[in-house]
Amino acid sequence: MNLVLPDVSLAPMLPVLLVLVGAIVSTLGGFWLPRRTLTALNILFVLASGASLVWLWGGAPWAAGMDVPRSAFAGALRADPAALLLGGTVLLGALLTLLVSLDTAYRARVSFAEFDALLMYAVTGCLLIAFSGDLIVMLIGLEIMSLASYVLATLQDSRRSQEAGLKYFLLGSVGSAILIYGLAFLYGATGTLNYAGIAQQVSALDPQNIGILVTGTLLVLSGFGVKIALVPFHQWTPDVYSGAPTLVSLFLSTVVKVAAFAGMLRVFGGALAAGPGWHSVLQILVALTLVIGNAAALYQQNFKRLLAYSAVAHTGFLAMTLLGDTAQGGAALGYYLLVYTLMTVGALAVVAALQRTEEGLTINDMRGLYYRHPAYAVALAFCLASLAGLPPFAGFFAKYLAIQVAFQAGYLLISVLAVLSSVAALVYYLRPAMLMFMPDRTPAREYAHGQRPATNVAVALSLIGIVVLGLLPNLWYGWVASPEIWRLLAGT
């Protein structure tokens, strides 16, 4: 009898392994390495992981002629184009977060050793989700990401941070339990955990198993709904984003959200693309998310809570892309996630740079910002305009693509609602933007002092990204719109 060994090629795992090594180095060396050295090392690990993505894509000069394997462990891990694209967005968000942390973590009273280690573990989980080829790997990545994120939310020694972390843990745990329960139903209906196997079974499913499949699908949708803050599973978002350190809020609203949508795209855009029932339910949830997210944001005075409800509204736009064709929807989602990461990092990096404590800036605190920090005021105004979807910024084209996907898929009411919600968003985005350029002889708040070179680099990169991708959207969309990127989404 011949012993058949599983495929254990490490090449598809290289981006994940490099970040994991960074996490281990932070864990072991965080208590004796200087704080800037530790963060600089993690930045190098993230850049190395990004370089490995380029190598796996085949775009690196040293990779010419090399036969690079695309999967490992019998397809459980897949380095397909969609994984590389979404993984690159995850790494970009992590890189910008680390840059901002160099200048602002000490003010937030956050331990560099703990912050860097937990962040790198969370990024490891995020990459596992993007590279997953079956439900087990996706679930492992999701739990690694979630557990590290729960602790990150509590890192600051304050009651608000502890409360935020507890709420995030409780509601996130419920979401994970629902998701696991749903995955069990999917396995019961299809008899496989592999995305490609599930897609094949769904297309030729025994009628007796349709009820089990629909139940599992709706449970999985609900579990992911908690992770991405889809209404009515969004209740944790404003409290966690406003109570956690701004650095952590930045990470949760970008990297974690990108990874969660990568998982949703794998499951609903690949394995369950032909599954029954979930499109109608997701349509209703998207409508609720657009309405409630924008309506709640109109009444916020705390700037981070405003951005939290804004994130809920953007979740609605991001989820709209899942309603359409996998190739078109995947391209729109890939573009939107990159743009959303840049916009959100830019806005929250400015907040992190300005605030002296973690009590949070109010909208009135923005009055007269231009006369004290003109560069930050202009950068924040550009980010808010892009979040609102105003041309010529990249946020306009991102929202346009999401609406186009829904419209061409036949969801006319959702498309109209998305347009109306974009108009409503102008009110709460432009209010702080206008206050920043109004003179104020008696400022309500004293901003933080000192040089913030790393944060300035992160803000500048974000600003350049949203302007260039707005003026020349095909620089990114023309690439991600290739059907070949999304053809292998289910692992087929």
From Swiss-Prot:
GO terms under biological process: ATP synthesis coupled electron transport
EC number(s) on file: 7.1.1.-
Name of the coding gene: nuoN
Subunit: NDH-1 is composed of 15 different subunits. Subunits NuoA, H, J, K, L, M, N constitute the membrane sector of the complex.
UniProt GO molecular function: NADH dehydrogenase (ubiquinone) activity; NADH:ubiquinone reductase (non-electrogenic) activity; quinone binding
Location relative to the cell: Cell membrane
Catalytic activity: a quinone + NADH + 5 H(+)(in) = a quinol + NAD(+) + 4 H(+)(out)
Function text: NDH-1 shuttles electrons from NADH, via FMN and iron-sulfur (Fe-S) centers, to quinones in the respiratory chain. The immediate electron acceptor for the enzyme in this species is believed to be a menaquinone. Couples the redox reaction to proton translocation (for every two electrons transferred, four hydrogen ions are translocated across the cytoplasmic membrane), and thus conserves the redox energy in a proton gradient.
PANTHER family referenced in this protein's UniProt entry, alphabetically: NADH DEHYDROGENASE
Disulphide bond pairs: none
Entry keyword Lyase: no
Lineage, top ranks: Bacteria, Thermotogati, Deinococcota, Deinococci, Deinococcales
Example of a GO cellular component annotation carried by this entry: plasma membrane
HAMAP family hit by this protein: NDH1_NuoN_1
Membrane topology: Multi-pass membrane protein
Name listed for the protein in its UniProt record: NADH-quinone oxidoreductase subunit N
